């Protein structure tokens, strides 16, 4: 019997971790993962449904798999909208929502029974990873308790469910033992970790720790590898983490989505609504940890956004001088409460504001990177091509930030650290030579 499974993982790093867990279970039960539809006995597609373009990509992928294979199991965020999938592809075998690991595996069992003698001893202790060996995503919770009006993640992934502290730390320890040099801490709301457990106390390696964001960062920092924080909602207690960055326990890098700067827009988004307070906090973080890299994301073209309110956002950008910034044009995701707001912004204006926003940020980034010329940086080697080495500094998360380019030199290996001197820069990347 064909025990081959095709697997497609779409969407964000949180979905990638879900895919890793499903694949680990399937491999442990003897299934073989294959890269093509035609060789597979069944195809599993982990979908994204966050914005309309992601929904369309997911539906297109399902249709392609149905056309080339015909035996498709669908899971992930879009699975929360089973009717959308059924309308587009009525013959899919099974549909489940996000983080439904057991349901997906059971569906595979139903339509493609596992082999009688699985080779579980071939599965590494840290499980199957879809990232390069030297870095891994560490998901610490599921779901979100926020009620942001532009977002439907709580509908798709449910309320906050923090993973047990010991489970997270055990996984982190296994990843380090497997050679991982960088952990990227992720969730829908990373800084809310432990809220749902009321910060319960647990025992870990002979000591008592609280199930809360600070304690988790402190314990991860003791591993002695890079620990990078993503999706950090700007709660007041985030300020307590910055000294850990200053002291070298975790990377001086904070991914903190701010979304806008105008108070009326922020209130309409149901986000923290004081840009003045945010600027004061940014100044405080930089005073405590001068090397901190601040990454954020913003939305332009939110319903009702006026030219004056957009200009306020640009002024905030110029004053905040953030290091890394992403920008999204507002997308009217089905089910989002913001869709009911008056005065939607036209697509032309969204596009024009997006380009103006990115122009401002490109200049900020260009000047910040130029100031790094002549400095010495520690970099992690990501890739070696025929003619160059591609690395990342402490300021650069994989996939979303800039890169550090080095001339190719023998003796350097992927996944190793190196000390480099920055020799040049452009809008988003650095160029360097070995010390």
UniProtKB/Swiss-Prot annotation:
This is Ribosomal protein uS12 methylthiotransferase RimO. GO terms for biological process: tRNA modification. The gene is rimO. Binds 2 [4Fe-4S] clusters. One cluster is coordinated with 3 cysteines and an exchangeable S-adenosyl-L-methionine. Keywords: 4Fe-4S, Cytoplasm, Iron, Iron-sulfur, Metal-binding, S-adenosyl-L-methionine, Transferase. SMART domains: Elp3 (SM00729). Its cofactor is [4Fe-4S] cluster. InterPro entries: Elp3/MiaA/NifB-like_rSAM, Methylthiotransferase, Methylthiotransferase_CS, Methylthiotransferase_N, Methylthiotransferase_N_sf, NA-bd_OB-fold, Ribosomal_uS12_MeSTrfase_RimO, rSAM. SUPFAM superfamilies: Radical SAM enzymes (SSF102114).
